[in-house]
Design a protein with these regions (language model features):
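Active-site nucleotide/adenylate-binding loops and adjacent lid/helix of ATP-dependent enzymes
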Residues: 1-7, 30, 84-184, 229-232
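ATP-binding N-terminal substructure of ATP-dependent carboxylate-amine bond-forming enzymes
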Residues: 1-95, 117-127
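Residue-level detector of structured alpha->beta connecting loops
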Residues: 47, 72, 172-175, 243
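Helix N-cap/coil-helix junction residues
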Residues: 73, 102, 107, 244-245, ...
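Phosphate-binding site of ATP-dependent enzymes
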Residues: 160-230, 254, 259-260
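ATP-dependent carboxylate activation and anion-phosphoryl transfer catalytic cores
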Residues: 222-297
Length: 297
């Protein structure tokens, strides 16, 4: 099978090479294409049998998926609409609420309160943003601040108004997301497959980058197992509600009483040491095995 891996200059070496090497072991012909170099015309001419989009590329927001749908070229991962929804936390939660209402069930996961601010608003209303966030975000400081730049950036945790202002100023050209921070165990849950046939892999503790310890969840094995099952159920329901396909990574927080949803990655990193790769390894799977299985479906 002729497979095209779509990547940009920033993730070409790591993400794209990981995917190419994995698929080549399945005896596929794999070529990496730069999405910044007339990618639509190139794909229209080459007509690969399948495309795979490297994490961190424009596929995070569904742009590349929509182009592939237009060209009628199959691709791994979720469709453009699901990617757009999962990239926006507020729309994700709205979709999840609609799903729960339609299924006549109770909401299994509680969202973290978050707000997005444009670069223009930060530049002109910085003090007001700080005041309103202090009034509206439950629990007060700390907050999480993340740039809205196209490339993925680290999240900054701010402890007071001064640090908050500094973090906002650093995002004056990009805009930012400000999110409630809660004490708890932060986990990344990898999900493989589509719909009701999807499988949830062991939750990964983000602090340790290792399988979450039952002892960290509760001193009682029975209670800890129940909490882990609830975390896995929440991840499964999020993917089902958002219509995610093939693979996803759901970031959750167990705050000691309930599961809170932080964000969803429809296009997770497959690189060695990533949460998705660690989850696969924990479950006895390999990235090459997972990708080649999905390609053959």
């Amino acid at each position: 099978m002729n497979i095209a891996v779509l990547a940009d200059s920033q993730n070409h070496s790591k993400e794209a090479e990981t995917i190419r090497e994995a698929l080549k072991k399945g005896d596929h012909t794999v070529e990496i294409y730069d999405v910044d170099q007339q990618i639509m015309a190139t794909l229209k001419a080459k007509r690969p049998d399948l495309c795979c989009i490297a994490a961190g590329t424009e596929g995070d927001t569904g742009v590349l998926q929509e182009m592939l749908e237009l060209l009628q070229i199959p691709f791994l991962g979720s469709g453009s609409e699901s990617c757009r929804i999962s990239a926006d936390e507020k729309i994700s939660m709205f979709s999840l609420l609609r799903y729960v209402e339609a299924a006549e069930e109770e909401l299994a996961v509680e969202p973290l309160v978050s707000f997005k601010f444009s670069a223009k608003l930060i530049a002109s209303e910085l003090d007001t943003i700080v005041q309103v966030c202090e009034e509206r975000i439950p629990g007060g400081y700390p907050y999480e601040v993340r740039s809205l730049a196209p490339e993925k950036t680290a999240t900054t945790t701010v402890q007071d108004s001064k640090e908050f202002k500094d973090a906002l100023k650093a995002c004056e050209k990009t805009g930012c997301l400000v999110r409630q921070w809660v004490e708890g165990i932060r986990v990344s849950v990898a999900v493989l497959g589509t719909g009701w046939d999807a499988h949830v892999l062991p939750p990964i503790d983000e602090t340790e980058n290792a399988p979450v310890s039952l002892a960290a969840l509760s001193s009682s094995d029975e209670v800890a197992q129940a909490i882990r099952s609830e975390i896995e159920r929440c991840a499964f329901e999020v993917c089902l509600a958002l219509g995610l396909r093939d693979f996803a990574l759901v970031r959750l927080v167990w705050d000691g009483a309930q599961v809170r949803m932080a964000e969803v990655e429809a296009l997770p990193s497959f690189a060695e040491g990533s949460a998705f790769e660690v989850a696969c390894k924990t479950a006895g799977l390999s990235i090459e095995g997972v990708l080649n299985h999905l390609v053959e479906l």
